[in-house]
Amino acid sequence: MKEGPISSSSNFNHVPVMGKEIIQSLKELPSELTKQGLIIDATIGGGGHSAQILENFPGIKIIGLDQDPMAREAASKKLIKFGTRIKIISTNFADFSLDEQAICVLADLGVSSHQLDEPSRGFSFRLNGPIDMRMNPKEGSSAAELIETLSEQNLADLIYELGEEKRSRRIARKIKNDLAENGPYSGTQDLSYAIAGCFPPKQRYGRIHPSTRTFQALRIAVNNELGSLESLLLKAPNWLLENGLFMVMSFHSLEDRRVKSSFKTDNRLKVLSKKPIRASPEEIELNPRSKSAKLRISAKKFLT
């Protein structure tokens, strides 16, 4: 599949969700940790959360991770004033290893507003672009290649399991029939139109767009998002000092269920947020994306 143009980082606007809540949680750590501690920002994005942390805690250093080259470029520009207090690494957090210990690991999961708003990335069904959806546009197979290679049965299973889409069988049948009869879709809106046709007319204009769950499923599969999350949940507690915080922000139930279960069953961690922390009504009004966010926080136990 021919790639679309790689967008500039200049428009990479990452609005940090629940920034105040994250800063407040860090302020509740023992002062000896925040005076000179290390934080791992596992999904640095445009650098929004890291900037807030570095501004509020002058002694803290951050290692920021991101597999998206545009995100890293944008974060580098935003955070350049902090000098050696910030180090940005090109990697998926699932592949990261740490030789020292941190006071906090922060992961803001999912797709960023910029990735959704940039047509060339192929994440959005509202803006036409190549059916790509890769977090790293230079690695792996695109969503277009995925739907071409999967069987109808496997595609239906994927849409059902990763998108929780009840019409997965009908959607998969439509996609595979279209590909067989007409060849590849011209772009994301062409695919979205085909998906919407699998719904009754009255359901095509509801609060949730008909393509939402299918596009979510394809994106999760293309980027192995759940596999990467499982790896992070297993590895991150080992990176933490005693009392260090593990904060994970998720945006859909598949992620949140895994985070909740892992925090509850991992004997290295103590759950600090019995229920997920949600964005305030004021924040939701300013940043609608924050409405679906759930922040869970745990702390590293002292293990004898």
From Swiss-Prot:
Its EC number is 2.1.1.199. Keywords: Cytoplasm, Methyltransferase, rRNA processing, S-adenosyl-L-methionine, Transferase. It holds the Pfam family Methyltransf_5. Specifically methylates the N4 position of cytidine in position 1402 (C1402) of 16S rRNA. It catalyses: cytidine(1402) in 16S rRNA + S-adenosyl-L-methionine = N(4)-methylcytidine(1402) in 16S rRNA + S-adenosyl-L-homocysteine + H(+). InterPro entries: RsmH (IPR002903), SAM-dep_MeTrfase_MraW_recog (IPR023397), SAM-dependent_MTases_sf (IPR029063). HAMAP family: 16SrRNA_methyltr_H. This is Ribosomal RNA small subunit methyltransferase H.
